[in-house]
Amino acid sequence: MKKFGKKVVLVGDGSVGSSYAFAMVTQGIADEFVIIDIAKDKVEADVKDLNHGALYSSSPVTVKAGEYEDCKDADLVVITAGAPQKPGETRLQLVEKNTKIMKSIVTSVMDSGFDGFFLIAANPVDILTRYVKEVTGLPAERVIGSGTVLDSARFRYLISKELGVTSSSVHASIIGEHGDSELAVWSQANVGGISVYDTLKEETGSDAKANEIYINTRDAAYDIIQAKGSTYYGIALALLRISKALLNNENSILTVSSQLNGQYGFNDVYLGLPTLINQNGAVKIYETPLNDNELQLLEKSVKTLEDTYDSIKHLV
């Protein structure tokens, strides 16, 4: 691979993509930011809008409209393009139509001579990230999904509101599928080293509050989609966080969608787990200790993803 730099190409200039572009320009994380979308007039307008305000970015950044050949020397290609999730529709129900869209995009990116990292956000993200890895033949550490990074942020936010602390003081994760089979790792969730689950149970006299927090985390996207059509600010900031960890060689641990290689006894499947992210990609999955119930829920999540992936294997 070439020397790691800071050129990012975004494929997909819808609500998620444009929100991510704005966040990236605001933070000045990339030196060059390229946007690709079939809606070329929209891209041109967004490029102008972003460049007009780039003076006030934290560091210089050039934004431009591009084509797939721009991926040739990109360090990171972020794919947000895909059919949106409709009210009442699960992420897994999007699978076949978005797999076909993804195949077209990834083929065009690879035809450019691309030799960088993929960051996938289109849903169902765990399935599509695995699909991109299989189609491209790239090493697993260079094909990363947004996973449960946003879910974990939602989880930490809801806990923080309940306990009256900042989100950054809450150490807790959502793992598994970015979707209905995701699970909360209550056995490890803590604030100041004290169990969140036990604290909630002591304060309320039951586990109802913990269950409510989990359900509100899991179903957050459905509520937002019902009210305003789609989610985009939260996932855009999650993508920003992952991009920053990659581009700035942070050695940060984030619950991205990574490919399992023996962890918890599973192989090949992609799902959200605490993963070390640096300039070499998703370099290490941390096998968080889980209790028996959590292990059963993880197995269920893996089975859900495996069954769904089997349904689109013919498209590889």
From Swiss-Prot:
It is an enzyme of class 1 (oxidoreductase). It is found in: Cytoplasm. Beta-D-fructose 1,6-bisphosphate binds at R156, H171. Allosterically activated by fructose 1,6-bisphosphate (FBP). It comes from the Bacteria. Its EC number is 1.1.1.27. Substrate binds at Q85, R91, N123, P124, V125, D126, D151, S152, A153, R154, T231. InterPro entries: L-lactate/malate_DH, L-lactate_DH, L-lactate_DH_AS, Lactate/malate_DH_C, Lactate/malate_DH_N, Lactate_DH/Glyco_Ohase_4_C, NAD(P)-bd_dom_sf. Homotetramer. Belongs to the LDH/MDH superfamily. LDH family. PANTHER family: L-2-HYDROXYCARBOXYLATE DEHYDROGENASE (NAD(P)(+)), L-LACTATE DEHYDROGENASE. This is L-lactate dehydrogenase.
